[in-house]
Amino acid sequence: MSHPLVMLLISDLSGRMRGKSVPVRGSEKLLEDGLGWIPANAALTCFGPMAKVENDALGELRLIPAENEPVSFFHEKLEIEQNWWIGKIVRMDGFPWECCLRSQLESALSLLQDRFQLQLEVGLEQEFYLTGRKDQLNTNSLEAFCEASDFLKAYAECLDSAGIEFKSLHPENGPGQYELSLPKLDPLKAADQLQLAKGIGRHCAARMNEHLTFSPIVSSVTIGSGLHVHFSLQDLEGRERNSIDGARTVSYTHLTLPTICSV
């Protein structure tokens, strides 16, 4: 890592990646000490200001690395050279903070394994827009690929330098809409790699004077963007445990999602 700084990052409910940067030299101390964080950061919105809350935030937290090593990526032509470290938030006693999204995923996966002797494998497909592109219906078209080929090439090269594998990077249904598809992985690794891939995409776009957005709706007249989650249930020996009855249950849950959750 020749860049002098490494950024310790978390992803929050606003969809932003946030964190703090420290010198690369001595950054191994983060594994033990972490960095200071505050509960009030949970109220930060995607637009910057904090949301209004009834009660004041109290106490302190620690931002610590979730893995032993940071991820480095580079692009010589764009003069990109970055070191990013996926993190998680813990309380001062070292236990996971209740609002840490990565810790929530870890807890859910442990519950699935311990209570039901099951594990998940997921494949993620993330759609995004490059705004300002031609106003044409370009579903999977060659024209849409060629129009953004310089960006897609740079994006792919940065992903490759970061060690992030992907299945495809192609035009989608909307004008200026594209999709990044990742291979099937352990859910925790898949989530980490998706967050890194999104951040890398934004950084590449900024260096090329493009505007990339993962917003679900960018216009009242174009199709929206989403994240597709393809998953399979397995027992602890890796045998498939998807079933017809299970599929019916999942289908019912999907149809009733509006009544059991809010976003």
Protein language model features and the residues they cover:
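ATP/Mg2+-dependent ligation/transfer catalytic cores
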Residues: 1-171, 193
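Secondary-structure boundary elements
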Residues: 114-120, 157-165, 190, 197-213, ...
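Core alpha/beta catalytic barrel or barrel-like domain that forms the active/cofactor pocket
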Residues: 120-132, 162-182, 212-228
